[in-house]
Amino acid sequence: MKHLKIDHLGIAVPNLEQAIAAYEALGFRVGATHDVPTEKVKTAFLPLGESHLELLEPTDSSSVIARFLEKRSGLHHVCILVDDLDGALDEMRAKGVPLLDQVPRLGAGGCRVAFVHPKGAGGVLLELKERERT
């Protein structure tokens, strides 16, 4: 499995507009926003070098992000960009790494993603994102 880079850091926020204002005050600019109905979140991506910060606001109290914010706030996940998501999942399964997603699903912007259980990654929720093929 070839890792290309950290794609983004996902940060759970209770209010997207307030969070954007705080980051803009630091000099960040919003690169893209997405409504992800399947995950019940709104997101904003802020470029940071070759990576991004992803701010995530829940749109429903039943979303994973809403439940996360009830317990804590802040860093939610680290996203690793990979060449071949199916191959990466196969390799992780072969090594006994617990997965939250056995098959890829669509993430923000329509890209293919899958999550690794924090128990298999030292307590960190990892998102694997497949690099767009050109």
Residue ranges of model-derived segments:
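Vicinal oxygen chelate
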Residues: 35, 44-49, 53-54, 80, ...
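Short, charged/polar surface micro-motifs in flexible loops or helix N-caps
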Residues: 50-53, 60-62, 85
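Short, structured motif recognition centered on aromatic/hydrophobic residues
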Residues: 6-13, 23, 46, 53-56, ...
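A cross-kingdom feature marking solvent-exposed beta-strand/loop segments within repeated
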Residues: 6-7, 26, 31-40, 59-76, ...
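Generic detector of contiguous secondary-structure segments
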Residues: 38-43, 84
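N-terminal beta-strand motif that seeds the catalytic metal site of vicinal oxygen chelate
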Residues: 1-18, 75-82, 131-134
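Conserved active-site tyrosine of GNAT-family acetyltransferases
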Residues: 19-23, 92
